[in-house]
Amino acid sequence: MSEKLWEKGYTVDEEVEKFTVGDDYIVDMRIIKYDIKASIVHSKMLQRTGLLTQEEQKKIEEALNELLHLVEEGKFQIKPEDEDCHTAIENFLVKKLGETGKKIHTARSRNDQVLTALRLMYKDELKKIKDLVVELQKSLDGFIERFGQIKFAGFTHTRKAMPTDFATWAGALRDALQDDLKLLETVYDIIDQSPLGTGAGYGVPIEVDREFTAKELGFSRVQWNPIYTQNSRGKFEYLLLHVLSQISYDLNRFASDIIFFSLPEIGFLKLPKELCTGSSIMPHKINPDPLELVRAYHHFVVSRMVMAVSLPSNLILGYHRDLQLLKKPVIESIDVVKNILRIMKIIFDRIEVDREKSEDSITEEVLATHRVYELVKKGIPFRDAYRMVAEKYGREKD
């Protein structure tokens, strides 16, 4: 029988327990390896400060490495009665080591414990997302090398506007992603603070070496104020989701462009059939479903970002169970953004440009603004030149 970390000798109503646990025991499988690694470092700190003997620390570390191996092999699952990964880890240690296992929670709370595991995961995931962004930028460079010189009519208000080329078009996404990388690095730096040792938001009444654990865990610095450390849960998630939403926003806009430009009626771009799906009733349909999902997933991420910024609002300082609900939306959004980055790389690696249809789109009216500036170069005031050209095209349309 699993014991709760907060066990006090009474039994919680079964429905209440199911409600409060929710699917946290499932979600926590994503962070358990980080919690195990942080627990190993925590045990080393306890030994350094005299709260564990060298032999006790060695046994705990060996047991935690065994658990980590089981997790990585898919041979360990958190049970609903464990509630979360923190309880599952401690119960494993107690079952394995007895009294020694009960010492692992000395000088920490589940609050700083989960913050530590989450931030370690966030840092890893941000690195992966950065790599995927860079890979997409390389694909964009390849697209520009193949098709960048081809011109076509750019659009405003979903109407033909002025000439542009595919180097400028694809370069816009590459540059947008570069700004996203700067934002990502800023968010990474903010998250890169160790919360371990702050307890439930008011520190722990015993000596701890927070600088040691921060260094061992790979954090660049310690987040010293214990109240702000707890208050930053929700804030840091919002910042993370904000940068994810910026990436998904840029991909959303370009997915819309590709869908529009690959319309048979437009035809600038050609999507390979293997990147499309079909209709269950209309045999002729070849649909850009992956791009439509890329477009839609931006709204998925934004909705999670709104949840992250609104859920902690109006809470007094300190931990609240409300914050448990942020884990799953953040993890889901991380996975979504990684997936849409991969899909957009595949798209840009394999999409083709129809040179003839693209260049044929630059009809006479698309050059109207250029005609205005030809007159300006002859000394005619811009507004007069504008009206002269506008009148000409107005007559032609009539």
Swiss-Prot record:
UniProt GO cellular component terms: cytosol
**Pathway, per Swiss-Prot/TrEMBL?**
Amino-acid biosynthesis; L-arginine biosynthesis; L-arginine from L-ornithine and carbamoyl phosphate: step 3/3
List the InterPro entries hit by this protein, alphabetically: Argininosuccinate_lyase, Fumarase/histidase_N, Fumarate_lyase_CS, Fumarate_lyase_fam, Fumarate_lyase_N, L-Aspartase-like
The entry's localization annotation reads: Cytoplasm
Enzyme class, spelled out: lyase
Q: Which GO terms describe its biological process?
A: arginine biosynthetic process via ornithine; L-arginine biosynthetic process
For this UniProt entry, what is the primary localization, expressed as one broad class?
cytoplasm
Q: Which UniProt keywords apply?
A: Amino-acid biosynthesis, Arginine biosynthesis, Cytoplasm, Lyase
Q: Which domain of life is it from?
A: Bacteria
Question: Which Pfam family is one of this chain's hits?
Answer: Lyase_1
Q: What is its EC number?
A: 4.3.2.1
Q: Does the keyword RNA-binding apply?
A: no
Known catalysed reaction(s)?
Answer: 2-(N(omega)-L-arginino)succinate = fumarate + L-arginine
> Which GO MF terms does the UniProt record name?
argininosuccinate lyase activity
Q: Which NCBIfam families match?
A: argH (TIGR00838)
The UniProt entry, under PANTHER family, shows: ARGININOSUCCINATE LYASE (PTHR43814:SF1)
What family is this protein classified in? Belongs to the lyase 1 family. Argininosuccinate lyase subfamily.
- Designated name of the protein: Argininosuccinate lyase
